[in-house]
Amino acid sequence: VHCESLEELRKLWFGENSSSIRQNPDADQSVEESFLDKETEFALELNNTSLYEEYLRQLLKDFLASYWQKNYLTHSWLAGRTPERFYIGNQFCHNLFPTEEQLFSIMDKMRSEGLEITLAFSYIREFMLPSVGKLLEKVDNWCCIHGMNVEIVVNDWAVAEMLHGKTSHLCPVFGTLLNKRKKDPRMKYKSGDISLFQQNSLNAEFYRDFLAEEFHIHRYEWESCGYPQEFPPGKNSLHLPFYQTNTSQYCPLYALCTTGDRGTQQLAEHCPKFCEKYALLYPEHLHMMGRYNSLFGVDKTFLESPEMWKKIKGIKPDRIVVNL
């Protein structure tokens, strides 16, 4: 199936005719009940300009109703609960972080609504170092004034170093770009022992100790990516249903829109936000799409079968992060 738009693709993946919505009478309802009883923290990502603007424009309940409706997940088991936390920013594209004015407006609104806050930073290019350092200082000051703690998702070692010397109000988190593992929607076509993929570097105790001692990192960001993972001791956040497979600082979508050739890539110094209107589409059976500077796969495992939560080996994530 070849879809004509991202909207059509989302409807095919998550709409009423999708197994993501259909209720399985044999499903273990205890998982959904424990989720609704808040045994696991629940968060949503605000990761692009349109979401920043919609959140600022609407009351929380109206924003959530619109969010689930636009993504065809109104009847999903996830939609039955109000998030306790929001992620602000994009882990994969530096041009999709909100403006400073937007950021503090969003943070003020979240504080008034009793929400916890996580700021997600991408890779940091050399020219960004001074501005990011100053922004972290302003966020630190905001936290001190309001008596709040804010998590900082780190996807560049420079940001981890910047957080040294800041107050305990800024809590570094190990981001997706640094938490590397093999991810590809085509892996389901491969034969072999997938158990070899279940662990990565964070399963090594000495590495976790290094992150804790050197950078005070105790939480790790993961993605649901189509096969079982063995999560390490500590605090683990699981992002779903989309997982990143490729990221380029030289945006292929920008190249395609400006030159007609996605291979003619260059740094988008003045980004016109083509990604607000356009995406790269692939045949539906591949379960993947291209958005802004990255490729993403979709893993509907937990949307379709929440009982799969019980099949996670080892430590279970203590936070679910929805990234539609």
PLM-predicted stretches and their roles:
Residues 1-106, 112-324:
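Active-site pocket-lining/capping segments in soluble small-molecule metabolic enzymes
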